[in-house]
A protein has these predicted regions:
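Short, functionally important secondary-structure microenvironments
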Residues: 1-193
Length: 193
């Protein structure tokens, strides 16, 4: 674990504090500059999953603003929407900066899906809401179906450059999903008349 901690510090280009704890997933605390990695059973925490978590979290260390949560809260943006889009942005940046990480992400997410980490086993992921499908798409589930008006959001998620763009897109996706829900509810009312 010491070698992995050193690697995380090198990749993040700073002397971040790396801690290992009993928890469900990894995190990066932007203010404390702390990368937390979970301690799982050996058969659950493979090298590829561990490396994926390190690569993902150092992306937050390098590119996520310190005040991300505060900025999103001030704008009353749903945190999970911001986090999903920000995850796609920082993972793209990590892959561009560290070419060897591309395989790490593919192998790690493949293993997490196989372990049902995302809770999708036996479910029709195409029935999930848009933001959850975008999340799964950028975690490697490329066989998902998106409507034409949704594809724009999927593409934009993969092209965000700044945190401001992340916030704007989160607001737009949230508004779109709300509008779609209202349309479906109105259609149900119309069908019963």
């Amino acid at each position: 674990m010491k070698n992995k901690s050193t690697l995380a510090k090198l990749l993040s280009e700073e002397d971040i504090n790396v801690v290992h704890k009993q928890m469900e997933t990894a995190y990066f605390d932007s203010k404390k500059r702390e990368l937390g990695l979970p301690i799982w059973k050996d058969e659950d925490m493979t090298k590829d999953i561990y490396d994926l978590m390190v690569c993902h979290e150092i992306g937050h260390a390098l590119w996520t603003p310190l005040d991300m949560l505060e900025k999103a809260a001030l704008r009353k943006i749903n945190h999970s929407f911001v986090n999903i889009i920000e995850d796609a942005r920082i993972e793209r940046f990590v892959k561009n900066k560290y070419a060897g990480s591309v395989g790490v992400f593919v192998r790690g997410y493949t293993e997490l899906v196989a372990k049902d980490f995302f809770g999708t086993k036996g479910k029709d992921i195409n029935s999930f809401n848009l933001i959850d499908r975008i999340n799964l798409y950028y975690k490697g589930s490329k066989d998902m179906v998106f409507a034409d008006d949704e594809k724009v959001f999927v593409e934009r998620t993969g092209n965000t450059e700044t945190f401001e763009e992340v916030c704007e897109l989160a607001e737009e996706i949230h508004a779109f999903m709300k509008e779609q829900k209202e349309k479906r509810e109105q259609e149900k009312i119309d069908d019963t008349d």
